[in-house]
Amino acid sequence: TMKKTLTLLLLTFSQFYFSQTIAEARNQSIGQTVTINGVATNGGELGAIRYIQDATAALPAYGNNLSSIQRGDSVSVTGVMFEFSGLLELSPTTSYTILGQGTMPEPLLIPITSANEDLEAQLVRFDNVSFVQSGFFSSGSSTVQITDGTNTLDVRVNGSTNIDGSEIPSGPISIVGLVGQFNANHQLIPRDLEDIF
């Protein structure tokens, strides 16, 4: 009947075109197409990837078509669930819309031992940590470590930030960044020098 057809069309439409929370999207299977709404917590400083966060979780979206998305933009992004070296992400992204200026989430203050799967891709902050290395960050992309005196965590310095080549701060610092993953290791990905203070 017409009513059943209309109901089926509405169900199909809602399944494909209405976004879900990012926490719900993270539970979808690899290969599933999803649409998420959230705030971009980074812009071009990390290259083609954009980290999108809402009140429930965060998810990176990867694609050269995202270059106009800037930090703080409220966006809707559609893409395919994919896992790259342990990091759950939307790749490829098939479409996006910039909805306007969003409200940047406050970095969640956590101990470095809490940088794990539960907070993957979210904006976090560590206080009273120190870099294990001294001297200067390598030119280009590199990985260094921070310590709280007992535990260590990898910090991935992306070569497209203004961090590479700069002096590594000595002594206790605070650092903000995105929780990433590469294979079995979780890592912190700062966006620029202002994330290290």
Model-derived regions: residue spans:
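OB-fold single-stranded nucleic acid-binding module
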Residues: 20-197
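Bacterial Sec-dependent N-terminal signal peptides
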Residues: 1-23
